[in-house]
Amino acid sequence: MTKLKKFGGKYKDETVERIARYFGFSAGLHFGTDKPDESRMKAAKKTLKEWTHGNGELFVIVDKKDTVGFVHINYRTGNTAWIEDIYVDETRRGQGIATRVIGLAEDKIKSHRGYTSICLEASPDNKAALALYHKLGYVTLGMITVRKEIYKNDKKNETELFGTDL
């Protein structure tokens, strides 16, 4: 059984580590490396503070009594809430946890009056996440963020988007 538990201090160290790994996963998609380093840990601590002092909620994901990740929900102005960040430990992926977490996050959002839609984002390189979101009824909006690295990296920037090689 998968549950969301409101983030609390007892989860701080492991959540900082997971945020750093989450940044590493994103970096791996973009830069070809996902190794946590001191600067990523520092950024993770800062991010945790921001997530717990803003307009959102941070939950740890508990599956079969094990803490296996986190989900961050942001209640922005207007009627759209955002599932900003979802992270499931690599060893627990492919077991349906993210599917259950999204459903639980949707229930949390529905409990807040006035929200009529939910958005989330994924890198075009993260095909597994995009496939999951589409399977769960999310549709791709027309806005695409593009990015240029100002320093050299060895990652080949080949992306397929909507069946078109970019």
What would you call each of these model-derived segments?
Residues 120-130, 146-153:
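Conserved beta-strand-loop-alpha-helix junction that forms the acyl-donor binding cleft
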Residues 88, 94-107, 131, 135:
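Conserved acetyl-CoA-binding loop-helix of GNAT-fold acetyltransferases
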Residues 13, 95, 127:
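Loop/helix-junction capping segments adjacent to catalytic residues or to phosphate/diphosphate-binding pockets
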Residues 2-80, 84, 89, 102, ...:
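Acetyl-CoA-dependent GNAT
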Residues 97, 114-115, 138:
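Helix N-cap/coil-helix junction residues
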Residues 109-121:
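Conserved GNAT acetyl-CoA-binding A-motif
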